Amino acid sequence: MCAPGYHRFWFHWGLLLLLLLEAPLRGLALPPIRYSHAGICPNDMNPNLWVDAQSTCKRECETDQECETYEKCCPNVCGTKSCVAARYMDVKGKKGPVGMPKEATCDHFMCLQQGSECDIWDGQPVCKCKDRCEKEPSFTCASDGLTYYNRCFMDAEACSKGITLSVVTCRYHFTWPNTSPPPPETTVHPTTASPETLGLDMAAPALLNHPVHQSVTVGETVSFLCDVVGRPRPELTWEKQLEDRENVVMRPNHVRGNVVVTNIAQLVIYNVQPQDAGIYTCTARNVAGVLRADFPLSVVRGGQARATSESSLNGTAFPATECLKPPDSEDCGEEQTRWHFDAQANNCLTFTFGHCHHNLNHFETYEACMLACMSGPLAICSLPALQGPCKAYVPRWAYNSQTGLCQSFVYGGCEGNGNNFESREACEESCPFPRGNQHCRACKPRQKLVTSFCRSDFVILGRVSELTEEQDSGRALVTVDEVLKDEKMGLKFLGREPLEVTLLHVDWTCPCPNVTVGETPLIIMGEVDGGMAMLRPDSFVGASSTRRVRKLREVMYKKTCDVLKDFLGLQ
């Protein structure tokens, strides 16, 4: 039997030995490896290949570990990062992520995501989205409501979004009623007419669904889809109706700031800001005609949507006279995008509100403006031709505000609008306004403020003191307050004498430009011929405001017209 001290001795030596062995292991602990998924971000491959161009910027991430194995955490157009499908460059010598086993194969390695395929990256099998598709067309209708060039493109889209898409039966749209037996109601591959028959079988663009007003909170993402049919297939463009500026036309695959037009001509606005509010217009064109559809967008700050909704339903009648007042554009401090009712356009439009509160014609949202001021029916002649989702396919007529003519279109039989007439005669009887009714359309200058300024021979601020009507022309005496531009008349020598301006080609039942006698200061832009000041129906004549005048002074100071000379074709 061993003595008790013997056991105690070996116990202490054992503890000491364990401590000595553990200390080096602690010192040799490896630093943590920052794991990175295979591949590179799309905008590292091509600066113009923006991430997340058709999704919602909601799949935010900080590192690759938060994403699927076939994805990377990449910067997006919203200023954050999103999980998106990785891209690959076929360049020898590129190194992949560290710490992965080599000499692996794709045998027995399955990629579960639709549209992904196995690839070896630095000896490691990984799943990546297909980056090449065959060029042969086989139009495929998918469960997301879109039509893809072929099945491969549908699978690639599903992979890039991390979703599942399935093939669905395509909707077949007749372009015109036909006396021959109708084709099958549905077909997987839509048939197309040969080029030789296009001249005999054409249809102007028509909408399938009503344009909808959307109201979103700051920071959200919103999209508009202009669902249009026609033969031949219409070309689509988007533009925002801008105040005193030329509209910027955007085509498919176009990015401008936080606004993207996708390859299917869907308008997407990311990280919406207050200044993004307004009316976005879709224009569809083909050889048979043109169509314009307006999509209003209201932007409210967080917590403001409920207050706006409640205030519009509080039962208080809005004074009708306030709706007829011009927008309050004076600058009294903070500027904000608001909506005002335009009586001539019979619609609500955006403007820059300067918080002067000279009148009540300013609203937070398009809906609040329409509820307060749209007491009468909507001007049906300004509505786009609407085919609707049904398939009765009957010929109808609609007034086209772009061409000023009534044109034929195909009506599906349901969910149409008021711009729908059974005959050309009925259409012409009602549009552009009912005969015998003296309501006139709003006068529209050919160009916006800056372009009109650069193209005009003279620009003055003044008030009309006298107006003389003649058969198809007229004369106006204008008291000039200030001369902003004068290239051919020498107005600085005029002194306080009124300037005589000749009005050309005037229809006095609905005169344009709308020159009226009064004390309201106007901005008048016109041409000079033989020393005579002249205004045409599309000349710019508008109410003077601090903001407009400030803009024109800025154009003069910066010599903007010299920069635009080549683009505008000025001499």
UniProtKB/Swiss-Prot annotation:
Protease-inhibitor that contains multiple distinct protease inhibitor domains. Probably has serine protease- and metalloprotease-inhibitor activity. Inhibits the biological activity of mature myostatin, but not activin. GO terms for molecular function: receptor antagonist activity; serine-type endopeptidase inhibitor activity; transforming growth factor beta binding. Residues 205-298 form the Ig-like C2-type domain. InterPro entries: Elafin-like_sf (IPR036645), Ig-like_dom (IPR007110), Ig-like_dom_sf (IPR036179), Ig-like_fold (IPR013783), Ig_I-set (IPR013098), Ig_sub (IPR003599), Ig_sub2 (IPR003598), Kazal_dom (IPR002350). The lineage of its organism: Eukaryota, Metazoa, Chordata, Craniata, Vertebrata. This is WAP, Kazal, immunoglobulin, Kunitz and NTR domain-containing protein 2. Residues 323-373, 381-431 form the BPTI/Kunitz inhibitor domain. Residues 1-29 form the signal peptide. It comes from Mus musculus (Mouse). Interacts with both mature and propeptide myostatin/MSTN. Belongs to the WFIKKN family. SMART domains: IG, IGc2, KU, WAP. Keywords: Disulfide bond, Glycoprotein, Immunoglobulin domain, Metalloenzyme inhibitor, Metalloprotease inhibitor, Protease inhibitor, Repeat, Secreted, Serine protease inhibitor, Signal. Residues 440-561 form the NTR domain. GO terms for biological process: muscle cell development; negative regulation of transforming growth factor beta receptor signaling pathway; roof of mouth development; skeletal system development; transforming growth factor beta receptor signaling pathway. The gene is Wfikkn2.
